[in-house]
Each structure stands twice: as C-alpha cells, then as structure tokens.
Curated annotation (Swiss-Prot):
Gene: RGS4
Residues that span the membrane, as ranges: none
PTMs per UniProt: Palmitoylated on Cys-2 and/or Cys-12.
CC per GO annotation: cytoplasm; nucleus; plasma membrane; protein-containing complex
Keywords: Lipoprotein, Palmitate, Phosphoprotein, Schizophrenia, Signal transduction inhibitor
Lipid modification (S-palmitoyl cysteine), residues: C2, C12, C95
Function: Inhibits signal transduction by increasing the GTPase activity of G protein alpha subunits thereby driving them into their inactive GDP-bound form. Activity on G(z)-alpha is inhibited by phosphorylation of the G-protein. Activity on G(z)-alpha and G(i)-alpha-1 is inhibited by palmitoylation of the G-protein.
Biological process according to GO: dorsal root ganglion development; G protein-coupled receptor signaling pathway; negative regulation of cell growth involved in cardiac muscle cell development; negative regulation of dopamine receptor signaling pathway; negative regulation of glycine import across plasma membrane; negative regulation of potassium ion transmembrane transport; positive regulation of excitatory postsynaptic potential; positive regulation of heart rate
Span of domain RGS: 62-178
A Pfam family recorded for this sequence: RGS
Name of this chain's protein: Regulator of G-protein signaling 4
Amino acid sequence: MCKGLAGLPASCLRSAKDMKHRLGFLLQKSDSCEHNSSHNKKDKVVICQRVSQEEVKKWAESLENLISHECGLAAFKAFLKSEYSEENIDFWISCEEYKKIKSPSKLSPKAKKIYNEFISVQATKEVNLDSCTREETSRNMLEPTITCFDEAQKKIFNLMEKDSYRRFLKSRFYLDLVNPSSCGAEKQKGAKSSADCASLVPQCA
C-alpha cells in the first residue's frame, strides 16, 4: 500500500527539500542573468543613438575623456555592471556630485552617506583603498570639507585607469560602438552613422 511522503525516511525528505531549494536558486539566478543581459543590450542601444563614432574613438585616448562624456560614462558603467564591479565608478560619481554641493550644512550628511556606502568596514559597496588612504578619509569625517574625498577618489580613478578601463577598451561594449560594421552594419542599407547602427549592436552580444 502506498504511504506517500509520510512513508519516506527523514533523510530522503531532507534531500528532496535541499534539491528543491537549489533548483529554485538556479532558476532565480538564470532569470537575473537574462534580465542583466537585456539591460546591457538596451544600454548599448541608447549610447549608440546619442554619440558619434568620432567621439567614441576619443574615449580610447584616456579614462578622463571617457567618463567626462555623458555617454562614455554610461557605457563604462554598463560594462562594470556586467562584471558586477560597478562600486568604483559609483564612488567616483558620488564624489563628483559631492564636490558640487553649495550648502555647507549639506556636506556632513552627504559625506557620511558616501563614507558608509563605500569606505567604512561595513560598507555595502566597499571600494579597494589602501589602509593609509582609508584612515585619512576616516579622519576627514570628523569635519567634512568639500575636498575630504579627493585622495580616495584619485586612488580609485588610478585603479580604474590601470585595470577596468583597459578591459573596457577590449570589450564588446566598446568595440561594437567604435566599429559598428563588425555587427554587420555594412549590410544594412542607409547605415551612414553610428546612430544608424544602434539597432544592430544588441544582435552582436
């Protein structure tokens, strides 16, 4: 006579439960990857539509050229997001926004928010700083000024310049923008500019 689940040993029930949990996790991870992939493709389309190839080529000259341009910054951020390492550029952006604050009364709360998010030991998006710079920035939090993150921002910029920026220039995120013909744009009638190639970029990913 069939006893159903009640007749199974406890160890079997635990194994089945563990397997169900693992399958659920894998399905969620798969959905997340597909979602991120879709977002990355859309990001590249928007970027293509808003910038010329001449400008894109300037991005290879320096990291400063890249992130000082709105679309270049968006492209670089999308690339870092695909590598799950966008905390460095997020910190750099936060520092740039911080330096634009005009009201002295707003400096302290904003500084503490940036510190807690990127620099403290329990930071949710901790950036890779050497101990000296981290300690110096921590001391600056006692009396935050408009320049209290300058040294830390400089270190993170140099880190991105030597590492992620070089990878970005070799990635499809950049190569598809600087050379849209590699996506088959030359086969499309009327493809006269990078904007015309926008719809083709996602198909190359």
